[in-house]
From Swiss-Prot:
Name of the protein in its database record: F-actin-capping protein subunit alpha
Main localization (coarse): cytoplasm
A GO molecular-function annotation: actin filament binding
One GO CC term, this protein: mitotic actomyosin contractile ring
Keyword terms, alphabetized: Actin capping, Actin-binding, Cytoplasm, Cytoskeleton
Location within or outside the cell: Cytoplasm, Cytoskeleton
Function: F-actin-capping proteins bind in a Ca(2+)-independent manner to the fast growing ends of actin filaments (barbed end) thereby blocking the exchange of subunits at these ends. Unlike other capping proteins (such as gelsolin and severin), these proteins do not sever actin filaments.
Organism: Yarrowia lipolytica (strain CLIB 122 / E 150) (Yeast)
Matching Pfam families: F-actin_cap_A
Amino acid sequence: MSRSNQEALADFVADAPPGELNQVVEAISTVVDGNSSILSKLETDVHNKILDQCMVVSLGKSKSLVSKYNQLSKDTFYDSQSGQKFEFDFDTKKATPSGSHGSDSPIQGALDKYFSAHFPSEGAAGVFPQDDGSIALVLVDGKYNPANYWNGKWRSVYIFESGSLSGTIDVDVHYYEDGNVRLKSSEKVDLGSVSESDIVDAISKAEQQFQEKLNKSFNGLNEDSFKALRRQLPVTRSKINWGKSISNYRLGKDINVGGGRE
């Protein structure tokens, strides 16, 4: 396969909708007729996709994240909430506890409280100190309902460095029943100078503003753009006699086909 074709397949993986990575890889496998050489080259792209999207995994009775921010080695990660270290299988998408890892950030408790108050229970949030002295705060949650043809995900990542806080908020929603509609929204936020004790409050305000802006844009889209796509009924300015003359209209003829009322 040419380099351009391989890059195109990599783009498909990178743009896989939330909760649908396995289906995308299976579809590619079908298209290339199970070519092991092509599929092996995609492994790196799949791994990068998982790390970039900060995949949520089950770790015992709790949830944790698989991301570059809490990666200790190729397949080893840690959970900042429980202080556990775990191995992650990129093929089966399963996490297995493998020991303890010191994690005692005072920010974690405040972040957990905020996360549990504003997000459903299918996600996870973590505080991960980085080698360069910065701190990464990652919040990920999603709702997946393939039985009703829709999936959605929220991912926000913030970096606290030298007293300043900045980050990116991403929302990705896919609806695919009798069609294919996808909402993707991403916004970079610069929250400026923030004390460590005020980090979570700053995040809360930024995400509230983002959600309000997103709701406003969506309502405008529904009222204006989508409304313009609808077929408008013609204005005839003629009156309809809903009494004796109803049978003269096509609707009346259709109603009277059965010859009576049940």
